[in-house]
């Protein structure tokens, strides 16, 4: 019985892995709201490449820019994550309440990454802290 369960689990895992598909795409293949966001918020940025990641449950789009900026969009075209490798993320994308909490508790820290989830936000700071906030922008977790 254990062997059958192990076999079924292995087949299910293989099936999920086989359905995962990362492929490069053109700008025109992005959802329209993602294209609009990029054109309005980052008109001077040069796109290096775009990857479409399709799996069993979701599709995401990773847009990589020459400057080190990376934006991940969900299947609906709304941004899910904004990060930069060489400079801070612009605070205009970070809710004011989160900016206020960070600037009062960690003066001088800047944002390297912001992720937006259904249940809240996660930010990574230049001082290497990772912070989680709930929907009401309350700090719920600190990871150093």
Task: Report each predicted region and the residues it spans.
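Bacterial Sec-dependent N-terminal signal peptides
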Residues: 1-24, 38
């Amino acid at each position: 019985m254990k062997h059958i369960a192990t076999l079924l689990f292995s087949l299910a895992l293989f099936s999920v892995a086989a359905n995962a598909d990362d492929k490069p795409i053109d700008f025109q293949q992005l959802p329209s709201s993602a294209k609009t966001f990029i054109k309005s918020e980052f008109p001077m940025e040069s796109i290096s490449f775009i990857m479409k990641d399709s799996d069993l449950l979701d599709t995401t789009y990773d847009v990589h820019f020459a400057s080190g900026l990376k934006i991940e969009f969900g299947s609906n075209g709304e941004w899910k994550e904004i990060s930069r490798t060489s400079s801070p993320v612009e605070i205009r994308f970070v809710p004011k309440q989160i900016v206020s909490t960070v600037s009062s508790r960690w003066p001088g820290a800047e944002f390297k990454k912001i992720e937006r989830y259904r249940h809240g936000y996660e930010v990574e700071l230049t001082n290497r802290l990772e912070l989680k906030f709930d929907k009401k922008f309350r700090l719920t977790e600190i990871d150093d």
